[in-house]
């Protein structure tokens, strides 16, 4: 039987060169699982706590030796002898062992590493792919990639307020073709930026980070790239934005200050009207974190205005948390949730959040973090849960491409798994 024999942990580096936690679980049967935990740059106030050492002499205070120590000295002795097939029980034990509502005692980075490594050991024991183990007979759909081709905000050093400008290839009939569409647009975008004398350096998530004059200019250049690649905006490819509004919300003014708009301060309603204008001018199908995570009245207004027309994704708003999501569902706020494993800290809680979203007809978007690794868990998770969408960066940087390449492998294995394209947005009425 796959009883846990030992759990190892170590400090490794993520795509930004910052430390993160890697966990390995070994069982008496010989089954083995490994997981590496990602890390975010723009983090929600209510996320589970990522434990950092705070020792300025090591990695500028960002070391994770305490989290590693917690895995080896606290978690391992408690889990020895448990079967890795008992995922729900293991995750409950991890939560109980931590004893805090936000996992601040042991650290969500320690807990998630163990949770995922146990699940991967279970898949290894059963000789299943990870998506097969998590999804059972359910995996039947390949996700639409939400590809972040222009980075701004906290993910880049430029004048663009909004954090991500994405392309969503919905026109193809396979994931393979969708990825090709995205890659071609990305390369055409690079050529256009060069022609305009703009840099083609990339941000944390692999998208270009040009110094543009406005957020709208980013949309215009992306449209130009889509057309240059031979595709039709609003038919073959749609646009999406991660505004990350909490990053430019001024709590004292209670306004949203856009640097690219000459530091103009917008009220919640004014910002919503700004979005309405953009949606009327451009083929935008998704806006993430359009308002601050605590601006629930603003979110309600945003949902009333645009909720039937486009996908309104809550990231910092919901932080992959069933309590937060339930509150949003009850108040009819947003219509989609971003799913980030390390926001909540265990596989079980993540799956519970996805299930809650689907029951309420909210879409679920499986997402990476800006600090990623070669770990491809989220690719499998997107297929396992039939999420229909995955957000894992642009077409550069191996930490991003690793997920796309894993999805190509999965599509080959599933053979007949459909790519639903625009039908993925099943809760939009217009």
UniProtKB/Swiss-Prot annotation:
Taxonomic path: Bacteria, Bacillati, Mycoplasmatota, Mollicutes, Acholeplasmatales
Signal peptide range in chain numbering: none
Keywords: Cytoplasm, Glycolysis, Lyase, Magnesium, Metal-binding, Secreted
Secreted in keyword set: yes
Active-site residues annotated for this sequence: 205, 340
InterPro entries xref list: Enolase, Enolase-like_C_sf, Enolase-like_N, Enolase_C, Enolase_CS, Enolase_N
Pathway annotation: Carbohydrate degradation; glycolysis; pyruvate from D-glyceraldehyde 3-phosphate: step 4/5
Name used for this protein in its record: Enolase
Binding positions for Mg(2+) per the UniProt entry: 242, 288, 315
Role played: Catalyzes the reversible conversion of 2-phosphoglycerate (2-PG) into phosphoenolpyruvate (PEP). It is essential for the degradation of carbohydrates via glycolysis.
EC number of the protein: 4.2.1.11
Transmembrane parts of this sequence: none
UniProt catalytic activity: (2R)-2-phosphoglycerate = phosphoenolpyruvate + H2O
Recorded GO CC terms: cell surface; extracellular region; phosphopyruvate hydratase complex
Cell location: Cytoplasm; Secreted; Cell surface
Cofactor note: Binds a second Mg(2+) ion via substrate during catalysis.
Cofactor: Mg(2+)
Alphabetical list of HAMAP family matching this protein: Enolase (MF_00318)
Any one GO MF annotation of this record: magnesium ion binding
Any one of the GO BP annotations: glycolytic process
Entry similarity comment: Belongs to the enolase family.
UniProt: (2R)-2-phosphoglycerate binding residues: 163, 340, 369-370, 391
């Amino acid at each position: 039987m796959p009883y846990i024999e030992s759990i190892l942990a170590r400090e490794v580096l993520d795509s930004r060169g910052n430390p993160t936690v890697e966990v390995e679980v070994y069982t008496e049967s010989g089954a083995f699982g490994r997981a590496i935990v990602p890390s975010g740059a723009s983090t929600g106030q209510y996320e589970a706590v990522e434990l950092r050492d705070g020792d300025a002499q090591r990695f500028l205070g960002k070391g994770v030796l305490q989290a590693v120590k917690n895995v080896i000295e606290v978690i391992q002795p408690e889990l020895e002898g448990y079967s890795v097939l008992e995922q729900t029980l293991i995750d409950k034990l991890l939560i109980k062992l931590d004893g805090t509502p936000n996992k601040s005692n042991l650290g969500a980075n320690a807990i998630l590493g163990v949770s995922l490594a146990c699940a991967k050991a279970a898949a290894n024991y059963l000789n299943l792919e990870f998506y097969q183990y998590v999804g059972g007979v359910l995996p039947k759909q390949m996700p639409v990639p939400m590809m972040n081709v222009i980075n701004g905000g906290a993910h880049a050093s430029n004048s663009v307020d909004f954090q991500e400008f994405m392309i969503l290839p919905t026109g193809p009939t396979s994931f393979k073709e969708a990825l090709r569409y995205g890659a071609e647009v990305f390369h055409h975008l690079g050529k256009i930026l060069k022609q305009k004398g703009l840099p083609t350096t990339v941000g944390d998530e692999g998208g270009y980070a040009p110094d543009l004059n406005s957020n709208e200019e980013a949309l215009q250049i992306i449209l130009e790239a889509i057309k240059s690649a031979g595709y039709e905006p609003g038919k073959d490819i749609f646009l999406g934005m991660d505004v990350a509004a909490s990053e430019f919300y001024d709590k004292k003014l209670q306004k949203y200050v856009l640097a690219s708009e000459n530091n103009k301060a917008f009220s919640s309603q004014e910002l919503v009207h700004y979005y309405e204008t953009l949606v009327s001018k451009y083929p935008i199908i998704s806006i993430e974190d359009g308002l601050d995570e605590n601006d629930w009245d603003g979110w309600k207004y945003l949902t009333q205005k645009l909720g039937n027309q486009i996908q309104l994704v809550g990231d910092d708003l919901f932080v992959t948390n069933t309590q937060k999501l339930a509150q949003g569902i009850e108040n009819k706020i947003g219509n989609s949730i971003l799913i980030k494993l390390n926001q909540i800290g265990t596989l079980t809680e993540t799956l519970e959040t996805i299930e809650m979203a689907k029951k309420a007809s909210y879409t679920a978007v499986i997402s990476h973090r800006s600090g990623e690794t070669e770990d491809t868990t989220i690719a499998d998770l997107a297929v396992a849960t039939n999420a229909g969408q995955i957000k894992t960066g642009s077409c550069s940087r191996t930490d991003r491409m690793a997920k796309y390449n894993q999805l190509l492998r999965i599509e080959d294995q599933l053979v007949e798994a459909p790519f639903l394209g625009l039908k993925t947005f099943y809760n939009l009425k217009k």
